[in-house]
């Protein structure tokens, strides 16, 4: 069981936070600060289950690669502790669990969940064919946003798509930082990423993406007529983005990873501003 837990990254909760924050942003906006408790539970559990499923299929896709990358060479596939059949079975079971949760919502959300499964299942293979797997990951992570609006309101309004765009931009930012950790190994074995694509322009491109993410969140705020508290949250996020730029200035592996981890705090700061705006 410990091996399966490691395969599903249950021992590394950072991914759950990165997935959960946009879901909470969406829930609070869609419900004007008072989301249905059952939907809060459904989507929180769904985040944990689908993130685990995504990690399993990612390791399956990278089973011939992870042994050649310093950061991943101790993963279950790389060390021979899990078989392909076991991983695929676990992926299917997790997807079925997630689908069972979605069945507790409404027809529109159920239909949209099919797209979520396709995005999660195909993401790990994109790094073989495009330098933009981080964008695909953003779509996979962010697709829960329109699903939340569908579940809470029965529709997917414009603000949901604005929030999805912001989430995709944010995911591209932090996953590019994550990819910078493995860039040297990825170049050697031919794995593609935005970190490889950007090269020496990586910090500049990350800064541009950070700015665009904040701009998208400003548009969300304007759309919902947010107050000062919301924009103070965005100001806090901007400060954390600046700190992340400081961390990655030398492009050292450990510092890039610290910058990646810092995004869990950033999502919380944005949520705090949003919640304060809706409740004060």
Curated annotation (Swiss-Prot):
Gene Ontology CC: plasma membrane
The answer on whether this UniProt entry bears the keyword Cell inner membrane reads yes
**Which segments cross the bilayer?**
14-34, 37-57, 88-108, 131-151, 154-174, 204-224, 228-248, 260-280
Molecular function terms, GO-annotated: 4-hydroxybenzoate polyprenyltransferase activity
Cross-referenced HAMAP family: UbiA (MF_01635)
> What this chain does, per the record?
Catalyzes the prenylation of para-hydroxybenzoate (PHB) with an all-trans polyprenyl group. Mediates the second step in the final reaction sequence of ubiquinone-8 (UQ-8) biosynthesis, which is the condensation of the polyisoprenoid side chain with PHB, generating the first membrane-bound Q intermediate 3-octaprenyl-4-hydroxybenzoate.
* Entry's family note: Belongs to the UbiA prenyltransferase family.
Q: Which PANTHER family match?
A: 4-HYDROXYBENZOATE POLYPRENYLTRANSFERASE, MITOCHONDRIAL, PRENYLTRANSFERASES
Q: Where in the cell is it found?
A: Cell inner membrane
Q: What is its EC number?
A: 2.5.1.39
Q: Which cofactor does it need?
A: Mg(2+)
Keyword presence, Cell inner membrane: yes
Which NCBIfam families has this protein been placed in? ubiA_proteo (TIGR01474)
| Annotated catalysed reactions | all-trans-octaprenyl diphosphate + 4-hydroxybenzoate = 4-hydroxy-3-(all-trans-octaprenyl)benzoate + diphosphate
Topological type in the membrane: Multi-pass membrane protein
| Protein name as annotated | 4-hydroxybenzoate octaprenyltransferase
Could you list this entry's UniProt keywords, alphabetically sorted. Answer: Cell inner membrane, Cell membrane, Magnesium, Membrane, Transferase, Transmembrane, Transmembrane helix, Ubiquinone biosynthesis
Q: What is its main location?
A: membrane
The metabolic or biological pathway listed in the UniProt record of this protein is: Cofactor biosynthesis; ubiquinone biosynthesis
Q: What class does this enzyme belong to in the EC scheme?
A: transferase
The organism encoding this protein is Halorhodospira halophila (strain DSM 244 / SL1)
């Amino acid at each position: 069981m410990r091996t399966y837990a490691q395969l599903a990254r249950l021992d590394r909760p950072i991914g759950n936070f990165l997935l959960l924050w946009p879901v909470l942003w969406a829930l609070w906006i869609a419900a004007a600060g008072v989301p249905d408790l059952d939907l809060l539970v459904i989507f929180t559990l769904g985040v944990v289950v689908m993130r685990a499923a995504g990690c399993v299929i990612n390791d399956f896709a990278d089973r011939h690669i992870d042994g050649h990358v310093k950061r991943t060479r101790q993963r279950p596939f790389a060390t021979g502790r899990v078989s392909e059949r076991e991983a695929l079975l676990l992926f299917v079971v997790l997807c079925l669990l997630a689908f069972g949760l979605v069945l507790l919502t409404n027809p529109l959300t159920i239909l949209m969940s099919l797209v979520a499964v396709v995005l999660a299942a195909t993401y790990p293979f994109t790094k073989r064919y495009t330098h933009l797997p981080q964008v695909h990951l953003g779509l996979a992570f962010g697709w829960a946003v329109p699903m939340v609006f569908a579940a809470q309101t029965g529709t997917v309004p414009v603000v949901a798509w604005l929030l999805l765009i912001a989430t995709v931009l944010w995911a591209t930012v932090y996953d590019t930082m994550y990819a910078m950790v493995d860039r040297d190994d990825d170049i050697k074995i031919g794995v593609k990423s935005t970190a490889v694509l950007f090269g020496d322009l990586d910090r500049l491109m990350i800064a541009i993406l950070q700015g665009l993410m904040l701009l998208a969140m400003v548009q969300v705020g304007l759309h919902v007529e947010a107050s000062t508290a919301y924009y103070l949250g965005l100001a806090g996020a901007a400060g954390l983005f600046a700190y992340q730029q400081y961390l990655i200035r030398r492009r050292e592996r450990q510092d890039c990873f610290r910058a990646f981890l810092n995004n869990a705090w950033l999502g919380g700061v944005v949520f705090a501003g949003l919640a304060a705006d809706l409740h004060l």
